[in-house]
Design a protein with these regions (language model features):
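Composition-driven recognition of glycine/serine/threonine/acidic- and proline-rich low-complexity segments
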Residues: 1-112
């Protein structure tokens, strides 16, 4: 069992929750140049992961599940990133409101 920082955020579109995300950052990954990842506050982790050449996604898994208790079952993806040689895990669940906003309700309801 390894100690980790857990970061949970909800992304909004027009003040409506559309993505629930959870990041797991092992404390051993939050040293040296990666230390800033442990102090992101409300800043976007995605900008840090996709903007920097020192980070790459090395594995992606599709998921069907609920991001939290009392939340609907929905599609998601889980990604493992390597940043400066250290791993971190990001799970994103695409809430039904996202599909409704983009006019693709069959994706959220027809496949589950």
């Amino acid at each position: 069992l390894r100690a980790a920082l857990i970061r949970e955020v909800t992304l909004l579109l027009d003040d409506t929750p559309v993505v629930a995300a959870r990041s797991v950052l092992p404390l051993t990954s939050l040293t040296g140049a990666n230390r800033s990842l442990g102090h992101m506050g409300s800043r976007s982790l995605g900008l840090e992961l996709y903007k920097r050449p020192t980070c790459q996604r090395d594995q992606v898994w599709a998921r069907i599940g609920s991001p939290a208790e009392a939340m609907p079952v929905c599609w998601g993806r889980q990604s493992r990133f390597i940043k400066r040689g250290e791993p971190l895990l990001v799970a994103e669940y695409f809430l039904p409101a996202l599909w409704e906003k983009v006019g693709a309700t069959s994706v959220s309801s027809g496949l589950l």
